[in-house]
Amino acid sequence: MKYTLLGFGISNKEILKYLLKKGERVFVSEGKKLSEVDKEFLNSFGVDFEENGHTEKVLDSDVILVSPGIHFENDIIKKAKENNIKIDTEISFCLKEFEKINWFPYVIAVTGSVGKSTTVSMIQHVLNKYKRTLLAGNIGIPIAKLLNDDLRADYLVLEVSSFQLFWSDKFKPNISSILNIYPNHLNWHPEMSHYINSKFKITLSQDENDFFVYNPNDEYIVKNLGKVKAKKVPFKYDFEIHQLPEHLRYKQTIENVAAAKTIVEVAGFEFNIDFLEDFEKLPHRMEYVTEINGVKFFNDSKATNAAAVIRAVENFDGKLHLIMAGIGKNEDYTLLRKVLKNSVKTVALVGPIAKDVKPYLDGINFMECSSINEAVNQLFRIANPGDVIMLSPGGASFDAFKNFEERGEYFKQLVFQLKEGKS
């Protein structure tokens, strides 16, 4: 059998390693320029490849494995469908391969606009106290890596994105969950209904023996419950924020904990809030950096859409100086404007997102800066003791950084440099 890997990101790299181990023929087609390291790797295994675009060479294959970010209206995808070539994705491909090696884990899959990584990490953290549990998916651990490293466990927790779900038609987790739905990725999805339908594909193949755990406070989710065949279980909000460990006492964490708690209980285990005492918060998500002259700094670089920014901003009571940066996602910022008007002293805009957000900042004090470095320094000059300066960008990082992690680390480095100069 011959496979084409359409896109050569982190997931397809792991799939390539797996297919080569099996002795399959593989062709790699990357829309952008490949790095020299990637070319060396492909050449060392004698793998044919193309870069800077997808040609009809892609069609000389039995199966095309699509990277999540490939747009569904890509011309080569249309031609592949016309030629009846099987199109598959990492999720469904890997789950079928698990069956071939007689591994049948209990699968828990979580999606949502914000909070996915924190929630799946909490689920794994608690389940590991009972059973061996692996975590993979959109959190940065390719599912195919589990195959390559021959990792097995009783439970498999997956974080899945709308892109991954769009391409996955036969995905049947034992428990699926949608945390929330906010307008997001509308630069990829043509309209909101398309985005919602992609999210709900997480439960499309489930039946009455499976479970769908959902947020009862999200109107987009509640309106679409009729299409769910699995047993429907709403989040349990049976705890107070003050009961959470101190490092988790943020408003958005309530939803994460409610989801994780309900899912763990549906899986048949007790979820004690005390289990989170040793849960390590993920970096770049409401991450406290340091305090300088009474001004606190927070790194929320993972906030790449308006909904995530809103959830972060709501934790502060009018003493916030906010840095927004990066590339916007074709969003409506009306709700963000209302929250900013009540909660921030200053908004510093950096990069392409400035032109998207500026029209919504009437009556809000804002400044445009050429870099995050300039924004940090300008805001620190005007901040008073008791104020907070937070990077919560609201946009993708690709205008200036490789990913949100690199952006967050850069911000923290700037803050510590500032502290050294002030100490």
UniProtKB/Swiss-Prot annotation:
<comment type="function">
    <text>Cell wall formation. Catalyzes the addition of glutamate to the nucleotide precursor UDP-N-acetylmuramoyl-L-alanine (UMA).</text>
</comment>
<dbReference type="Pfam" id="PF08245">
    <property type="entry name" value="Mur_ligase_M"/>
</dbReference>
<dbReference type="GO" id="GO:0005737">
    <property type="term" value="C:cytoplasm"/>
</dbReference>
<dbReference type="Pfam" id="PF21799">
    <property type="entry name" value="MurD-like_N"/>
</dbReference>
<keyword id="KW-0067">ATP-binding</keyword>
<dbReference type="InterPro" id="IPR036615">
    <property type="entry name" value="Mur_ligase_C_dom_sf"/>
</dbReference>
<keyword id="KW-0133">Cell shape</keyword>
<dbReference type="GO" id="GO:0009252">
    <property type="term" value="P:peptidoglycan biosynthetic process"/>
</dbReference>
<keyword id="KW-0132">Cell division</keyword>
<keyword id="KW-0131">Cell cycle</keyword>
<dbReference type="InterPro" id="IPR005762">
    <property type="entry name" value="MurD"/>
</dbReference>
<protein>
    <recommendedName>
        <fullName>UDP-N-acetylmuramoylalanine--D-glutamate ligase</fullName>
        <ecNumber>6.3.2.9</ecNumber>
    </recommendedName>
</protein>
<dbReference type="GO" id="GO:0005524">
    <property type="term" value="F:ATP binding"/>
</dbReference>
<dbReference type="InterPro" id="IPR036565">
    <property type="entry name" value="Mur-like_cat_sf"/>
</dbReference>
<dbReference type="InterPro" id="IPR013221">
    <property type="entry name" value="Mur_ligase_cen"/>
</dbReference>
<dbReference type="Pfam" id="PF02875">
    <property type="entry name" value="Mur_ligase_C"/>
</dbReference>
<keyword id="KW-0436">Ligase</keyword>
<dbReference type="GO" id="GO:0008764">
    <property type="term" value="F:UDP-N-acetylmuramoylalanine-D-glutamate ligase activity"/>
</dbReference>
<dbReference type="InterPro" id="IPR004101">
    <property type="entry name" value="Mur_ligase_C"/>
</dbReference>
<keyword id="KW-0573">Peptidoglycan synthesis</keyword>
<dbReference type="GO" id="GO:0051301">
    <property type="term" value="P:cell division"/>
</dbReference>
<comment type="pathway">
    <text>Cell wall biogenesis; peptidoglycan biosynthesis.</text>
</comment>
<feature type="binding site">
    <location>
        <begin position="112"/>
        <end position="118"/>
    </location>
    <ligand>
        <name>ATP</name>
    </ligand>
</feature>
<dbReference type="Pfam" id="PF21377">
    <property type="entry name" value="MurD_N"/>
</dbReference>
<dbReference type="GO" id="GO:0071555">
    <property type="term" value="P:cell wall organization"/>
</dbReference>
<keyword id="KW-0547">Nucleotide-binding</keyword>
<keyword id="KW-0963">Cytoplasm</keyword>
<keyword id="KW-0961">Cell wall biogenesis/degradation</keyword>
<dbReference type="GO" id="GO:0008360">
    <property type="term" value="P:regulation of cell shape"/>
</dbReference>
<comment type="similarity">
    <text>Belongs to the MurCDEF family.</text>
</comment>
